[in-house]
């Protein structure tokens, strides 16, 4: 592990996206525009609802974010799948941060509920992931619950987010 801070700014996230944070062939965040947060404000190995880890991140919402111009014309809203992907991105980051080896892949989730939308007038999105379990065998598998809030109101809840880290020769579809 090269870098194990308790928070990461945008430059740190970009370094992760370039593969510079956890070593070659290991967990990477996507680069913009698919990187769905601007900073990780907190990451711990023993915090969160289940005492097994917590990661919290933020996105500063601006009306010119790329998805508002195309989803939908005259009715801009952040696609719900992008908020979900942010939660998966965070689980993968956590697995790399704890020393897991391999490339991250989202593997599914148990349940997802939307009760609001991310609209251009929103100022800040906060993402929270509570780690429930990490299994380390042929692959590293993380299972977590997460939520997304807009300006303090929780509008997405995801249960049993699953992310795996796969060695390059063991990744799904290879």
Curated annotation (Swiss-Prot):
GO terms for cellular component: cytoplasm. Gene3D superfamilies: Hotdog Thioesterase (3.10.129.10). InterPro entries: FabA (IPR010083), FabA_FabZ (IPR013114), HotDog_dom_sf (IPR029069). The active site is at residue 71. Its EC number is 4.2.1.59, 5.3.3.14. Pathway: Lipid metabolism; fatty acid biosynthesis. One of its GO terms (molecular function) is (3R)-hydroxyacyl-[acyl-carrier-protein] dehydratase activity. One of its GO terms (biological process) is unsaturated fatty acid biosynthetic process. Homodimer. This is 3-hydroxydecanoyl-[acyl-carrier-protein] dehydratase. The gene is fabA.
């Amino acid at each position: 592990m090269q870098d194990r801070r308790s928070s990461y700014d945008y430059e740190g996230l970009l370094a992760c996206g370039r593969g510079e944070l956890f070593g070659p062939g290991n967990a990477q965040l996507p680069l913009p525009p698919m990187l769905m947060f601007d900073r990780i404000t907190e990451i711990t190995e023993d915090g969160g609802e289940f005492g097994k880890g917590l990661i919290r991140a933020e996105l500063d919402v601006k009306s010119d974010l790329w998805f508002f111009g195309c989803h939908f014309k005259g009715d801009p809203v952040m696609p719900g799948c992008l908020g979900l992907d942010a939660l998966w991105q965070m689980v993968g980051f956590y697995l790399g941060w704890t020393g897991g080896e391999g490339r991250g892949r989202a593997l599914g989730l148990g349940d997802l509920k939307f009760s609001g939308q991310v609209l251009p007038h929103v100022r800040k999105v906060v993402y929270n992931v509570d780690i429930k379990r990490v299994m380390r065998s042929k692959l590293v598998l993380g299972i977590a619950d997460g939520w997304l809030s807009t300006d303090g109101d929780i509008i997405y809840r995801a249960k049993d987010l699953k992310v795996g880290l796969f060695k390059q020769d063991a990744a799904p579809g290879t």
